[in-house]
Amino acid sequence: MGNGSGRRRGTIGGGRHEAGGRSLVVILDGTLSTLDTGRSTNAGRIYKLLHDLPTGQRPSVFYEEGIQFSTWRDLRHVITGTGINPQIQRAYGFLASRYRPGDRIYLFGYSRGAFAVRSLAGLIDRIGLVRPRFATERMIRQIWRLYRTDPHGAHAQVFARTFCDPGVRIELVGVFDTVKALGWRLPGLAARAERETAFH
């Protein structure tokens, strides 16, 4: 598991699309939490349980560990929770590229990951989930800008009618120890974090 963000990410399942739809599961973990023994959370345990299902019963799952501390440059993100927005966009891209009519969406998160999946649910509810053929990085950045600036405006409504699937429903949002993305309120860092995450 790996990605450009420096966090481990895992996907399981997601092969063929069965009649009656399939389950798409997003699991976002908390700060400093991983799948490693002694650092796993309820979010990580859910991922492991799904991973251990027989191959034919596994849903399509996206898991991403929380913000990690590997160098001093990571300290600001660990303290304030900044950097959560790209995580939400990656999870959105996973869903948008795989969703087909009839699929069921389940979102799970722990701590800041709980905040993230709630925001992801808000993004899908307010604007929508783009159809798979439109699930490009550029399109996801565009819908993110709409969500940040004017999710109820005319532009967002036109975007939703043009690019989004109107029948998307979220079956469940399961959160553990949900918090605001902003962590410790240090001068300067707190103000910047508020600007980056207040729109959620």
Range-by-range predicted roles:
Residues 2-200:
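Alpha-helical segment proximal to the catalytic Tyr-Lys
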